[in-house]
Amino acid sequence: MAVSKEDILETISNMTVMEIVDLISAMEEKFGVSAAAAVAVAPVAAGAAAPAVEEKTEFDVVMTSFGANKVNVIKAIREITGLGLKEAKDLVEGVPSTVKEGISKAEADDIKKKLEEAGAAVDVK
């Protein structure tokens, strides 16, 4: 009498974790294979397709120009980053410069809006 896959799966689902570990060890010995090799291959195949589907979750705000009103842009940079006057001035004058890195889309859009209102040209990457 042949045992169906459903019967095997039902039996395994009723086993404890230790019994399953023993079963896997016995199968490795009987068939001369390693379960670790099969597990290591599966994530590689899944990982190869994942980057095409992944959505970007972290964004960088990059100021490309400070425009005509540098003082207002420096004030906005100080408010956003908490930098001192000299550091904020150096950041503004060193365009293109990264204002913030690894932030959410909403926060990046908020910072972009504040800087554009102050007169800066900003990209979210």
Curated annotation (Swiss-Prot):
One of its GO terms (molecular function) is structural constituent of ribosome. One of its GO terms (biological process) is translation. Coiled coil: none annotated. It comes from the Bacteria. Keywords: Ribonucleoprotein, Ribosomal protein. GO terms for cellular component: cytosolic large ribosomal subunit. Disulfide bonds: none annotated. CDD domains: Ribosomal_L7_L12 (cd00387). Belongs to the bacterial ribosomal protein bL12 family. Homodimer. Part of the ribosomal stalk of the 50S ribosomal subunit. Forms a multimeric L10(L12)X complex, where L10 forms an elongated spine to which 2 to 4 L12 dimers bind in a sequential fashion. Binds GTP-bound translation factors. Forms part of the ribosomal stalk which helps the ribosome interact with GTP-bound translation factors. Is thus essential for accurate translation. PANTHER family: 39S RIBOSOMAL PROTEIN L12 (PTHR45987), LARGE RIBOSOMAL SUBUNIT PROTEIN BL12M (PTHR45987:SF4). NCBIfam families: L12. This is Large ribosomal subunit protein bL12. It comes from Methylococcus capsulatus (strain ATCC 33009 / NCIMB 11132 / Bath).
